[in-house]
Design a protein with these regions (language model features):
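Flexible, compositionally biased loop and terminal segments
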Residues: 1-166
Length: 166
């Protein structure tokens, strides 16, 4: 490949299996996962990827048991309040959360909104998808395309992903 992909999707997967196989708690597994996501984001930024979308929590995942959700939320809040601010320059990086904020804990949403307000740089964009549903995105893109009188492919908020890392 002569150039880096413009947009990379990250799907953290296997953290529950890793916890079981290694005798670790879910909380520890999800925290390690958030640290690994941060490492990958930094590598993508160094390699001149323009946008990275982290598929954090689908709407379907919200049906998981409370102990699993609490571990995901805690690691996500750590990612938002500690890892992202410590590793990414707000003057060069931007952040945006996509999904149904009404379905997420207030602390999670507040942490994401704080990053959205402060991280507005032009060089590297981080999208976080939480309480996200692809069908909702399709419906929203369809409505935007009709309102803006444009092709539906130009109306997606996330944009086309060139490569997925799972």
């Amino acid at each position: 490949m002569d150039r880096s992909p413009a947009h990379v999707g990250l799907i953290p997967d296997g953290l529950r299996r890793w916890a079981r196989a290694n005798g670790a708690s879910l909380a520890d597994a999800y925290l390690r996962g958030s640290e690994k996501v941060t490492e990958i984001l930094l590598a993508l930024q160094r390699n001149e990827v323009q946008t990275a979308s982290v598929y954090n929590l689908s709407r379907a995942n919200l049906a998981r048991p409370d102990d699993q959700l609490e571990a995901v939320y805690a690691a996500s809040i750590y990612f938002l309040t500690t890892l992202v601010p410590a590793n990414f320059d707000a003057a060069t990086c931007s952040f945006r959360m996509h999904g149904d904020r009404d379905l997420l804990p207030a602390e999670f949403v507040a942490a994401a909104e704080a990053l959205e307000a402060t991280m507005t740089g032009p060089d590297f964009r981080i999208n976080l998808l939480a309480a996200y549903d692809a069908e909702d995105e399709l419906r929203s893109a369809y409505r935007r395309a009709q309102a803006q009188e444009c092709d539906i492919n130009d109306a997606f908020e996330i944009g086309r992903v060139d490569m997925v890392i799972r």
